[in-house]
Amino acid sequence: MSFNCSTGNFSRSLGGYLGVPVSTCDSFYPSNVVYSPSTFQLGSTLYSDCQENFFRPVSFQTPCAVTRSFQTSCSHPQNFIFRSPCQTIYTGSLGSGNIGLGSFGCGSTGFQSLGCGSNFCSPTYVSSRSCRSSYY
């Protein structure tokens, strides 16, 4: 199983692709999205996958009271399944405390409410998410 971490659709030697959660806000800064290889162990087997890191610029103003939506696309060969959940981790502060962590299951839409208590804020945080796969 091989992954191409240069795109959001990770190529696999057995065909098909692995879709990762995509934030509608991230499309404003596609150059700030970086994919890197990562590995995880399931039992005695070591698997490889990709992790997506999104670096939001300080200058990006966003309404704090909105809800960020993450849609997942989990198309894959039938001999593969996803280990849930796909995990999105926020680090940093929005001026009213840490955002914390949100977990979203594959094949579904997850929502993370920001709610800063003010009309606008300048988020300076890193969003990191990964979707892992394994055999049946």
From Swiss-Prot:
<dbReference type="InterPro" id="IPR007951">
    <property type="entry name" value="KRTAP_PMG"/>
</dbReference>
<comment type="similarity">
    <text>Belongs to the PMG family.</text>
</comment>
<dbReference type="GO" id="GO:0005882">
    <property type="term" value="C:intermediate filament"/>
</dbReference>
<comment type="subunit">
    <text>Interacts with hair keratins.</text>
</comment>
<comment type="function">
    <text>In the hair cortex, hair keratin intermediate filaments are embedded in an interfilamentous matrix, consisting of hair keratin-associated proteins (KRTAP), which are essential for the formation of a rigid and resistant hair shaft through their extensive disulfide bond cross-linking with abundant cysteine residues of hair keratins. The matrix proteins include the high-sulfur and high-glycine-tyrosine keratins.</text>
</comment>
<dbReference type="Pfam" id="PF05287">
    <property type="entry name" value="PMG"/>
</dbReference>
<keyword id="KW-0416">Keratin</keyword>
<dbReference type="GO" id="GO:0005829">
    <property type="term" value="C:cytosol"/>
</dbReference>
<protein>
    <recommendedName>
        <fullName>Keratin-associated protein 15-1</fullName>
    </recommendedName>
</protein>
